[in-house]
């Protein structure tokens, strides 16, 4: 954890200035190239981390900016005016940091929040499936107890940052027939055996968004990598989807 306990949240003006400087320095020169499919991960996430943009809603004690949601939406609107795809990639990784700090401050956040906020790691959320879309009650990805952890099996598709991610929050069914009550969320690492990226056909202009699929074949997650237990994950993801509808609308304006 980065100790910023004595600091005050940055003003909205200073954050917007930092976002504008980042946009002019990194997005303007690269947007056209990325739009043709020539995306370089390090040119986006690490500079964004250095500008503080990977911690917009992360608490101060973790080194974040502790912005209210409305100011986060304003920052995303500014970035999206120049490169919507890149802005979506950034916010999706940022959202995982905020999620880990909230849900797992003693286990997962100390391991991953720092590198995610610096842009040294990239994260994504894997919900959508080929046969179920984003309908949590009908997802087919399963999580089965294995010793002290879980084995994940299934396929996700149309996932933002799937092509870039080092860490993925995977939503999976832990008990067949239990509907949303059995859904849990796990943090899976891309270097785990059985983790496979799957290409999806999309427009080259979206290359910085890293849209892709994931195939999980007996991917092992330690018990400590359970982000939300069964019964908790559904409530969290539905709230997250509602927030996303709001900030994506702001990005489109």
Where are the predicted features?
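Intrinsic disorder at enzyme termini
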Residues: 1-11, 143
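Glycine-rich beta->alpha junctions and the first turn(s) of the following alpha-helix
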Residues: 3, 15, 199-253
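Internal helix-loop-helix
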Residues: 50-119, 161-167
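Short glycine/proline-enriched turns and hinge-like loops at secondary-structure junctions
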Residues: 67-69, 135-137, 161-165, 179-182, ...
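Glycine-rich phosphate/pyrophosphate-binding beta-alpha loops
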Residues: 81, 93, 157-162, 206, ...
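A short, Trp-centered hydrophobic/proline-enriched beta-strand micro-motif
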Residues: 119-127
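Cytochrome P450 C-terminal beta-domain/meander region
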Residues: 135-153
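A short core secondary-structure module
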Residues: 153-197
């Amino acid at each position: 954890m980065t100790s910023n306990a004595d600091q005050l949240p940055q003003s909205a003006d200073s954050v917007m200035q930092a976002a504008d400087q980042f946009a002019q320095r990194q997005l303007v020169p690269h947007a056209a190239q990325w739009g043709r499919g020539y995306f370089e991960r390090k040119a986006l996430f690490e500079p964004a981390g250095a500008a503080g943009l990977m911690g917009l809603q992360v608490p101060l004690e973790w080194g974040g900016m502790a912005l209210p949601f409305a100011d986060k939406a304003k920052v995303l609107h500014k970035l999206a005016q120049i490169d919507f795809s890149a802005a979506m990639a950034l916010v999706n990784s940022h959202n995982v940091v905020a999620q880990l700090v909230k849900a797992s401050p003693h286990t997962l956040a100390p391991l991953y929040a720092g590198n995610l906020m610096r842009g040294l790691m990239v994260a994504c959320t894997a919900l959508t499936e080929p046969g179920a879309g984003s309908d949590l009650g009908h997802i087919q990805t399963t999580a089965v107890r294995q010793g002290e952890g879980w084995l994940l099996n299934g396929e996700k598709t149309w996932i933002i940052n799937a092509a870039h991610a080092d860490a993925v929050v995977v939503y999976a069914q832990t008990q067949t027939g239990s509907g949303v009550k059995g859904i849990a969320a796990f943090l899976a690492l891309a270097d785990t055996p059985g983790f496979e990226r799957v290409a999806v056909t999309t427009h080259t202009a979206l290359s910085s968004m890293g849209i892709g699929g994931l195939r999980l074949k007996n991917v092992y997650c330690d018990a400590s990598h359970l982000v939300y237990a069964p019964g908790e994950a559904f409530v969290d993801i539905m709230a997250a989807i509602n927030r996303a509808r709001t900030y994506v609308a702001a990005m489109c304006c």
